[in-house]
Amino acid sequence: MKRVSMIVSGQVQGVGFRYYVQDIAEDMRITGWVRNLPDGTVEIDAEGKTDVLETFIRTISNTRQGAIQVRNVHVQEKEVCGYSIFTIRRD
């Protein structure tokens, strides 16, 4: 099991990116959350099996879908905390 925090920049707010991330996470059985940040980036906190989480990171990093254009993803490993679902946070 592994947990990462990701800061995603590019055209990622106002284009359905958080919902896209949630769909991918749920399909891959990844838990955690996603939220918009005031500076126009999106933060993702994700937890899952190491190999699945690596695939998730690659998928997010390579997203070019419709108006969504990911330009950069900063990933930092964190201590596993045991999320049970994946949610969109609005804080």
UniProtKB/Swiss-Prot annotation:
Belongs to the acylphosphatase family. The gene is acyP. Keywords: Hydrolase. This is Acylphosphatase. Residues 3-90 form the Acylphosphatase-like domain. It catalyses: an acyl phosphate + H2O = a carboxylate + phosphate + H(+). PANTHER family: ACYLPHOSPHATASE. It is an enzyme of class 3 (hydrolase). It holds the Pfam family Acylphosphatase. SUPFAM superfamilies: Acylphosphatase/BLUF domain-like (SSF54975). Its EC number is 3.6.1.7. GO terms for molecular function: acylphosphatase activity. The active site is at 18, 36.
